[in-house]
C-alpha cells in the first residue's frame, strides 16, 4: 500500500485526515493478524532499508544478511525499492512519502518489539507464544476501530486484470454496487446500512491476485465521498 503524505492537499479537512488514519491502521493490523507473512514483511523492510539507506544495522545479526533483495510480500515495499534505486539523493528520499513509509514500518516494528519483549532482528522466527500474543493484541485493537470509516460513500477502483471475481463472490462483500467497465472493476459502497470497515478493506485486498497497492485519490466532504484506486 502506498501511504499518502498526511500534509498533501487531499488531507486538509479533519474527515479526510481521519480516513487517512483509517486506511493506515487497517493495513497495519491486516499485516499483524496474518503473522505467517509478518516475518517476511519485517525482514524485507529491514533488508531493503539497510541496503539502500544504511538503516537498521543493529537489527541485522552477522552472517544472516542476504545481499539479494527478496520478492516483497507486500507491494508497499516495492514502490519504495523504486524510490531507492531511481532516486538515491537525500533530498528525494526525505520527502513526505518516504517519511510516512518509515513511520508506518516503525509502528509495525515497535508493536512487534513490545509483543516479543525485545527488538525484532532480521531472521527471527516467531514462536507460538509470540504469534498468539501478536494476534491477541492486534484483535483487541481492531475490535475498537472496525467502524471508523468517516465517509458514507466509498468508491474502490481495481484493474480488471488483477481482480479475482471468484474470490469476490466467496467473500460475499455486502452492500456493494459492482460495476464492470472496460479496464476496471468499480465497487461502490454506501454506509447508510452497513459500515465500510477494516474487514471490508481486507476482503477487497484478498480479492486482488497481484501485489497491488492503493492510493486515496479523492476525499469530498460535501458529498461525503471518498475514492480509492488500486494500482497494478
UniProtKB/Swiss-Prot annotation:
Species lineage: Viruses, Varidnaviria, Bamfordvirae, Nucleocytoviricota, Megaviricetes
Gene source species: Acanthamoeba polyphaga mimivirus (APMV)
Protein name: Uncharacterized protein R422
Top-level division of the source organism's lineage: Viruses
Amino acid at each position: 500500500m502506498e501511504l499518502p503524505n498526511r500534509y498533501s492537499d487531499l488531507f486538509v479537512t479533519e474527515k479526510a485526515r481521519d480516513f487517512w488514519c483509517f486506511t493506515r491502521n487497517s493495513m497495519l493490523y491486516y499485516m499483524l493478524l496474518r503473522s505467517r507473512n509478518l516475518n517476511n514483511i519485517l525482514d524485507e523492510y529491514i533488508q531493503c532499508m539497510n541496503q539502500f539507506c544504511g538503516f537498521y544495522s543493529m537489527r541485522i545479526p552477522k552472517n544472516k544478511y542476504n545481499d539479494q533483495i527478496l520478492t516483497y510480500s507486500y507491494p508497499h515495499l516495492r514502490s519504495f525499492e523504486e524510490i531507492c534505486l531511481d532516486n538515491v539523493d537525500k533530498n528525494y528520499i526525505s520527502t513526505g512519502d518516504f517519511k510516512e513509509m518509515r513511520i508506518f514500518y516503525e509502528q509495525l516494528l515497535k508493536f512487534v518489539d513490545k509483543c516479543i519483549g525485545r527488538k525484532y532482528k532480521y531472521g527471527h522466527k516467531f514462536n507460538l507464544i509470540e504469534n498468539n500474543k501478536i494476534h491477541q493484541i492486534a484483535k483487541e485493537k481492531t475490535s475498537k476501530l472496525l467502524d471508523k470509516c468517516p465517509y458514507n460513500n466509498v468508491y474502490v477502483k481495481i484493474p480488471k486484470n488483477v481482480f479475482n471475481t471468484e474470490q469476490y463472490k466467496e467473500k460475499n462483500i455486502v452492500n456493494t454496487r459492482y460495476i464492470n467497465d472496460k479496464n476496471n472493476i468499480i465497487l461502490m459502497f454506501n454506509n447508510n446500512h452497513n459500515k465500510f470497515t477494516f474487514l471490508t478493506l481486507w476482503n477487497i485486498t484478498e480479492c486482488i491476485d497481484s501485489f497491488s497497492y492503493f492510493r486515496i485519490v479523492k476525499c469530498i466532504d460535501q458529498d461525503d465521498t471518498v475514492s480509492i484506486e488500486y494500482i497494478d
